[in-house]
Amino acid sequence: MIDQITIGDKSSFEDFEASVAQRKIKMPKKKSIKETVPFSNRTYDFSAINGEVYWEERELEYIFEITADTPEQLEDLKREFAAWVAGVQEQELYDPHIPYYHFIATYDDLDPEDDEGLDKTTLTVKFTAYPYMVADSQKVYEADLAASGQTTLNVLNESTHPVPLTVSTTTRITMKIGTAATAPLSPGSGTYGALKLPTGLTTIELTNSEAVAGSVRISFHEEVF
């Protein structure tokens, strides 16, 4: 099986004859916030002062090999491949060596090496990416709400950190995630960056603010290192 990556509706080998020869998936670096105390050996780390540590972008490096039948074909493939990767901006990058998850990647650099003869070349491509790998599949929890009724959902988040929720509701509701209550949510669907689901098992309390029955759908993508 040919080793390749997929971004959008194109794959490196199927569309550009570029197979992955090597890959380097780096861990993101921690965003450190430290303060030293004068005339002291102590250093204080405030990186998690808001309850969560934050991370720099992750670096991805792929070495591709392109083989062609003629020098002219090789040059065409190189140009097309370079144009493809250079246009990658916060897109989903799928690597078969990392099943069930993908990266949110942006093109950073392309370094072409000297052609190996007339029909083969090697190109090193670097991407920067969102620090976490994102699950391909959503987790979905649904509930029906009686008129002015209340129900609870036990939601499991196996991510490395709290993740944002997408909520779809047919009536005006109030959500309580663990011990934190939210403002009422109007009917419709939205992803709420400030509405974070903690890691582990969390009880979500849903209250219907209207005198008609409704339904709620909660979804999210797990994120891991």
Residue spans for each PLM region:
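Polar/acidic, low-complexity leader/linker segments enriched in S/T/G and N/D
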Residues: 1-37
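Intrinsically disordered, low-complexity segments enriched in serine, threonine, and glycine
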Residues: 133-225
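Mixed-charge, glycine-accented linear interaction segment located at domain edges/termini
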Residues: 6-12, 128-130, 160
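Oligomerization/assembly interface segments of phage tail-like spikes and tubes
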Residues: 47-72, 119-132, 202
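Short beta-strand and beta-hairpin "edge-sheet" elements
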Residues: 26, 90-133
